[in-house]
């Protein structure tokens, strides 16, 4: 369990189209084997420490003739942002993916101060 040491909690969120490979015959739509797409997401304000980030697929357009294989994760989470990562493998053909994200964590509080 992550314990927050601040009385001010921040929640930031967004919804990002990660790719649309059907439009230009991109690798996720035409390729085979292990494939990955990632995007750096920046928070609207800095957190006091790295927040907890939750991702969910809000849209996917996948070929019905192949097995659906997908891995969605956040990596390199810092106080200012994170990497949104989508992976697939095998014969899965992915036309497009949109991922919703939520980050929650402690923010600095103007009423808090450190005694040195």
Task: Indicate where each model-derived feature is located.
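Glycan-recognition/cleft segments
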Residues: 66-77
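Extracellular receptor-binding modules and their adjoining Ser/Thr/Gly/Asp/Asn-rich linkers
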Residues: 1-49, 60-63, 77-116
């Amino acid at each position: 369990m992550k314990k927050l040491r601040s009385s001010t909690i921040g929640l930031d969120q967004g919804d990002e189209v990660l790719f649309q490979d059907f439009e230009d015959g991109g690798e996720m739509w035409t390729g085979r084997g292990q494939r990955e797409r990632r995007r750096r997401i920046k928070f609207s304000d800095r957190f006091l420490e790295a927040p907890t980030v939750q991702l969910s697929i809000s849209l996917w357009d996948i070929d019905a003739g192949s097995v659906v294989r997908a891995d969605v994760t956040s990596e390199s989470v810092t106080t200012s942002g994170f990497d949104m990562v989508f992976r697939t493998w095998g014969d899965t053909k992915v036309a497009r993916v949109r991922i919703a994200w939520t980050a929650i964590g402690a923010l600095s509080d103007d009423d808090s101060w450190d005694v040195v």
